[in-house]
Amino acid sequence: MKKTLIWCLAGFVIVALCCVGLSVNLHAQGDTAQQIKELQQQSRDAQMKNDASWAQQHLADGFVAGNSWGDWETKDDFIKDLQNKTNKWKSGNISEVQVATFGSNIAVSHYTFTYDAELRGTHRARTVICSDTWINDSGTWKTAATHCSMVKGK
C-alpha cells in the first residue's frame, strides 16, 4: 500500500511539473507574439517616417524584401529607399496582424497594409497582404524577409 501511494504521488508530481512547463512555454509564445505585433507596428511607423535607423537595427543580415510591384530588395536597397527624400507617405494603415511562433527564435507575422504614397516617382495607392519572417538574433528580434502582394489598387 505504501509503495502504491509513493508511485501515485510521484506520478502526480511529474504530471504537475509537465503542466507547469507547458504553461510557461505557452505564456512565452504569447509574449513573443505580442512583441512581434508591436515590432510590426513600429516597423510600419518607421517606414511612414522614412526612418532608416529603425531598419538598420531591425533588419537581419541577408534580409530580402519582395514588394508588391515585383521587385526584390536587399537590406541595403531597402534602407536606401527609406533614405530617399522623394519618397512621400500620405497614409498607411496596418491591420489584421497575426503572428505564428516556431519555437523561441522564429516567428512569422502576416497582415494587411493599406497605403497611399509616392515611391520612386510613382504614385501607389493600394492594399497589400504581407508576411514577415522574424528571427531572434541574440535577444533582438529582426526581420529576415518580407513579402507583400497586391490585393487592390494601383
Language-model features: locations:
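Bacterial N-terminal signal peptides
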Residues: 9-21
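N-terminal membrane-insertion alpha helix
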Residues: 23-25
